[in-house]
Amino acid sequence: MTTAVPRLIEQFEHGLDAPICLTWELTYACNLACVHCLSSSGKRDPGELSTRQCQDIIDELERMQVFYVNIGGGEPTVRPDFWELVDYATAHHVGVKFSTNGVRINPEVAARLAASDCVDVQISLDGATAEVNDAVRGAGSFAMAVRALENLAAAGFADAKISVVVTRHNVGQLDDFAALADRYGATLRITRLRPSGRGADVWEELHPTAAQQVALYDWLVAKGERVLTGDSFFHLAPLGSSGALAGLNMCGAGRVVCLIDPVGDVYACPFAIHDRFLAGNVLTDGGFDQVWKNAPLFRQLREPQSAGACGSCGHYDSCRGGCMAAKFFTGLPLDGPDPECVQGYGAPALAQERHAPRPRVDHSRGSRE
């Protein structure tokens, strides 16, 4: 590791003038009801930001020189002004990456996307077969996602992403996912299952076993050179030598990443939609720039963090204690071990009596909110 890398990580830990990765959930409306949805999406929130309010945020992002925004939901393409907002963002030098289940990616839309140099598309797929995928994402969702990939490939869209949430039921399909990506000229992106949103209700039964975590690490080291992971799997880093696993080995919440939700609330992390991690609101707290730079929560997160119960572990520098959201939503202390700690410290903590907080909002169809 060069000396530049530790300096860069130190800079990340103290926060940047603008987020590297800004996730923006434009809507909670969704045509699917995935059992592990991190935002408990389904129904549109009546307080959803207007088109003009969204454009004001984009204007701020341009002034802050944010490179791109990662748009999700819900299913963002069902919002009536989605394409208007995409065009507005790219015209104002803010690139767009959006996540979709593929419902609106018909041949005409695929051709439109292929003609743009500023838009990246990520198709969600949680099984390399319909049987595995549809068990968590709903009947017909596999065929819908594959049809979107086919349309993008036929239109000449370069380098779509296939985004996979790794579960104990699909971790054995990693080679199949990679083959699927190759078939459509796409790049594979895999992410960690967090106990966030509806994921809190199914985490115990869906998260990979300890043996599968090791198998996942081995696969990433052996075959993951062209696989995107972001900061999803830094909790696996203690399984090998320093630098063996690509990606950022730290929690970027409030430092280099954050989330704007459909009503303008700003959270430290896309997987931590709870009052504990609410930094402010773009409408009532002076705009996004003001929240990002001055919110007390973000200032706190950018201070040196205590290693807590993990301080005596020789692997702390590798994983930094793991994922904040995973700990919080399983009822574990934030300065304790990750629930999936590969050194085995998470399992005893999970076995103790604990209170797991519930997500702040639930827009699932059938919920009362």
Curated annotation (Swiss-Prot):
GO terms for molecular function: 4 iron, 4 sulfur cluster binding; lyase activity; metal ion binding; oxidoreductase activity. InterPro entries: 4Fe4S-binding_SPASM_dom (IPR023885), Aldolase_TIM (IPR013785), Elp3/MiaA/NifB-like_rSAM (IPR006638), MftC (IPR023913), PqqE-like (IPR017200), Radical_SAM_PqqE_MftC-like (IPR050377), rSAM (IPR007197). It holds the Pfam family SPASM. Residues 347-369 are annotated as: Disordered. Radical S-adenosylmethionine (SAM) enzyme responsible for the first step of the biosynthesis of the enzyme cofactor mycofactocin (MFT). Catalyzes two reactions at the C-terminus of the mycofactocin precursor (the MftA peptide). The first one is the oxidative decarboxylation of the C-terminal L-tyrosine of MftA, forming an unsaturated tyramine moiety. The second reaction is the cross-linking of the tyramine with the penultimate L-valine residue, forming a five-membered lactam ring. Its activity requires the presence of the MftB chaperone. Interacts with MftB. This is Mycofactocin maturase MftC. It comes from Mycobacterium ulcerans (strain Agy99).
